[in-house]
UniProtKB/Swiss-Prot annotation:
PANTHER family: 3-OXOACYL-[ACYL-CARRIER-PROTEIN] SYNTHASE 3, BETA-KETOACYL-[ACYL-CARRIER-PROTEIN] SYNTHASE III. The last Arg residue of the ACP-binding site is essential for the weak association between ACP/AcpP and FabH. The gene is fabH. GO terms for molecular function: 3-oxoacyl-[acyl-carrier-protein] synthase activity; beta-ketoacyl-acyl-carrier-protein synthase III activity. InterPro entries: ACP_syn_III_C, ACP_syn_III_N, FabH, Thiolase-like. Keywords: Acyltransferase, Cytoplasm, Fatty acid biosynthesis, Fatty acid metabolism, Lipid biosynthesis, Lipid metabolism, Multifunctional enzyme, Transferase. One of its GO terms (biological process) is secondary metabolite biosynthetic process. The keyword Transmembrane does not apply. Residues 259-263 are annotated as: ACP-binding. Pathway: Lipid metabolism; fatty acid biosynthesis. This is Beta-ketoacyl-[acyl-carrier-protein] synthase III.
Length: 333
């Protein structure tokens, strides 16, 4: 009987670089109010959102990803040819096949890197980060590019008072590579498929194709149910991630939750009893909810503005449609 040779990977993995891309068009709440009966004050009080970015025709999922990835690769101090795998998390690449990751890998100039898409909604970045960590430790890649990218404006119903103001577009990317010490903690992840109706696409693509519906599919959600789930259940998941990493809330430097809603963020901070010394990402105010892109975009902005620094210990958690979630403690690049 032949024995399979064991893989030889790095002892640990870490985030080496981060990059982001926000579309050029900035959309204030006043534009949203043209199609819904609401007010700027109501939107801000309910979500914290003041503006969001919407992509133009040239700012495709692939184009935004390439821009963000180029910055992440440069920040990591490597070349595109060294990237061994490209993982893209998105729900707004409207071709079932091929995966947009293959186009991105090619246009970046990788050397035939493995490339694939994943669909895990707003938790997608955490899922991709976990896969990348495993690939590096297992030895199937030395450097992995993880991208979260969305054009949620394409799936926004501007007449839906509950969601019209929420969503934005953008791309965030990180390079994950080898490390001699732990820098990405254990992932606490999972799904609650019994709550699938809480956040969903209004109708399947096939219904639209067959003429069964007149309106283009959009994302809808049960706002109160999502809020309660995020505040009460996701705070527990975040605490589990801290416990698994052996890090106390008082020892954190940064908290980067999915940028869904500032009220949710505030409630999680309170439930986790985070001290005032912890920097909390609030990119949602000017970027809106960008689903899979929200965590890397928020991470990039904190580092760019100096609110966080390389080497800081950060708790990251994503949660959304599925319902799915993923949380871990990481060292910032």
């Amino acid at each position: 009987m032949s024995k399979i040779k064991p893989a030889k990977g790095a002892p640990y993995a870490r985030i080496l670089g981060v990059g982001g891309y926000r579309p050029t068009r900035v959309v204030p709440n006043e534009v949203i109010l043209e199609t819904i009966d609401s007010s700027d004050e109501w939107i801000r009080s309910r979500s914290g959102i003041q503006t969001r970015h919407w992509a133009n025709d040239e700012e495709t999922v692939a184009a935004m990803s390439i821009e963000a990835s180029g910055k992440a690769i440069a920040d990591a101090g490597i070349t595109a040819a060294q990237v061994g795998a490209v993982i893209v998390s998105t729900v707004t690449h409207f071709k079932q096949t091929p995966a947009v990751a293959t186009e991105i890998a090619d246009k970046l100039g990788t050397n035939k890197a493995a490339a694939f898409d994943i669909s895990a909604g707003c938790a997608g970045f955490g899922y991709g980060l976990t896969l990348a960590k495993g690939m590096i430790v297992e030895g199937s890649a030395e450097y992995v590019l993880v991208i979260g990218v969305e054009r949620l404006s394409d799936l926004t119903d501007l007449e839906d008072r509950a969601t019209a103001f929420l969503f934005g577009d953008g791309a965030g990317a990180v390079v994950v590579g080898p490390s001699n010490e732990p820098a990405i903690g254990p992932t606490i992840w999972g799904s609650e498929g019994d709550k699938a109706e809480t956040i969903k696409q209004t109708v399947p693509w096939t219904d639209y194709r067959e003429g069964g519906v007149e309106r283009f599919p959009a994302i809808t959600q049960e706002g109160q149910a999502v809020f309660r789930w995020a505040v009460f259940e996701m705070a527990k998941v975040a605490q589990q991630a801290l416990d698994a990493a052996g890090v106390a809330a008082a020892d954190l430097d940064v908290f980067i939750p999915h940028q869904a809603n500032e009220r949710i963020i505030d409630s999680m901070v309170k439930t986790l009893k985070l001290p005032e010394s912890v920097t909390v990402a609030r990119d949602v105010r000017t970027t809106g909810n960008t689903s899979a892109a929200s965590i890397p975009l928020a991470m990039e902005r904190l580092l760019a503005t100096g609110e966080a620094k390389s080497g800081d210990t950060a708790l990251v958690i994503g949660f959304g449609a599925g319902l799915v979630y993923a949380a871990s403690v990481v060292t910032l690049p």
